[in-house]
């Protein structure tokens, strides 16, 4: 089957936003206008096409990024709907990795919200071009100008409107296109009938002023345009469009549009902007990988059907009908169903059973995937998130994804023996799907411990075990993942010597431990001169330190953010061994614990609480009583917003407390921000508890 849409006519986009900004509804409308669905499903009725998991429909939020394909104006648009809830940031991170562009949806009343900032930062890390859609223009308190100002103030983004709304709230009736200086009026409720009219007289000055600001913002990124602008020369529509496209693709400018997805206004114009301004796979820089056989050698995966096949698996999920589905993005070459591919990350050969083009939760079988496509494969047994798939003769590894460690843990216990086996299977499958979800058995207690990015994250996973795998389990109280670190430096010796007849054991190391920067992790430096510790034992010293650091030095929590410099030592020709040096390194760490001022660290969450003004005093007092540090307040519409950093241990069960403090009128979001030292008195309690005193 030949290629249906050329690479120039392909767009791979994500739709990202804060929870409740209307992201899923926006995607629904895109599918409606592109003819993919015939009846529009509303999220608040639990009937949305993209939210297909039962937990999503119950809660009205999007958890897994469903991938879907639509056609618009002769182009193929592959859309990934990403979750806006903070516990699911990993889903966003995964999808951004494989996108060429994104639409950031803002709520016209709130503008940029905390989760928007997080997702925006992630998109900037991956260099994803974006357009901004200010949604909910029909909502009470909708304010387009305010929303645009939050892009500048909170994100320092070079953004400018390419559209202006006429009216807001109930009066929102038309949209002015500043590039072509036209006006579009909606004449029916489904938004399918649009009338092009002249810009009304009373809005002309405002539109001309906004167009001048737009040209100025874009001209900053284009010398050619700047010359024309400064010389007061006429700038044609095609020149302006091309300059906006260039600046957007280079992530130097963000066009801002407006509309209301719920009331069906502005979505088609937003689709036009996706085609006009977001890049095709040919417009973005080719992805650079390296050879599996030689990590130093760079390999380019070019968007070209005739090149070697290379793809990245970005999501694994279990489908009730076809089993394990692996979603992947093709960067170069083509692949047919039934063929063999190589998983170069794991060095395994895999057979692709069937290829599916996804549409929320329905699917269409296809024979071939081409470069630039996003599809799902059935039959890949060993492939996980972040793995590279390539042709059998190829051995490219594309840059993988890094995922954060869990910050909260729970114990789960099956209710019956029958549940035991099912639970093991369920945990294996859920870990395959979600790299931030960890499960292990505690060696001392025999309990199964699961870890994730927040209470909601674990709630939903326990819920899925029950609904999808029929596993009934009892859930223990949440446990916070503490860490340990050193505050000062010291030089120490670790010596292991044992003679017990026959061959002995001997290893001797001198190591300097120093604190590392926050978040930098463990760094090992080999500074041995003259072979006082033979080269073959150096990896054992590093491995010994890493193993010992897993169990910490104070209360059994992993030791992080430490530098270790091996600068001296000695060995014995006969008695030295890898094991002896491993043990010597762990003894050095024990010695360092006495001299390096170890402390316990706790996860600090960035918390944003929104509530009516009258509860402000109560909430501030409550945050302080939870050892929180208030980081600022601001009005948002007729509500107040408090930003704070609060220890996770103090935020467990906060939803119930906030509800009672605000009579159910407050909302909050939180996500992990950093680790910070815990107060001494609390640290002492934790140490005692862990030692069973």
UniProtKB/Swiss-Prot annotation:
NCBIfam families per record: EF-G, PRK12740.1-3, PRK12740.1-5, small_GTP
Swiss-Prot/TrEMBL GO biological process terms: ribosome disassembly
UniProt-recorded Gene Ontology molecular function terms: GTP binding; GTPase activity; translation elongation factor activity
Identification of the protein by name: Elongation factor G
Primary site of residence: cytoplasm
Organism: Staphylococcus aureus (strain Newman)
Protein family according to the UniProt entry: Belongs to the TRAFAC class translation factor GTPase superfamily. Classic translation factor GTPase family. EF-G/EF-2 subfamily.
GO-annotated cellular components: cytoplasm
Gene name of this polypeptide: fusA
UniProt keyword list: Cytoplasm, Elongation factor, GTP-binding, Nucleotide-binding, Protein biosynthesis
Source superkingdom: Bacteria
Described purpose of this protein according to its UniProt entry: Catalyzes the GTP-dependent ribosomal translocation step during translation elongation. During this step, the ribosome changes from the pre-translocational (PRE) to the post-translocational (POST) state as the newly formed A-site-bound peptidyl-tRNA and P-site-bound deacylated tRNA move to the P and E sites, respectively. Catalyzes the coordinated movement of the two tRNA molecules, the mRNA and conformational changes in the ribosome.
Residues annotated as domain tr-type G: 8-282
Pfam families according to UniProt: EFG_C, EFG_III, EFG_IV, GTP_EFTU, GTP_EFTU_D2
CDD domains per the UniProt record, alphabetical: EF-G, EFG_III, EFG_mtEFG1_IV, EFG_mtEFG_C, EFG_mtEFG_II
InterPro entries, per the entry: EFG_II (IPR041095), EFG_III (IPR009022), EFG_III/V (IPR035647), EFG_IV (IPR047872), EFG_V (IPR035649), EFG_V-like (IPR000640), EFTu-like_2 (IPR004161), G_TR_CS (IPR031157)
Subcellular location: Cytoplasm
UniProt-annotated binding residues for GTP: 17-24, 81-85, 135-138
Keyword Cytoplasm tagged: yes
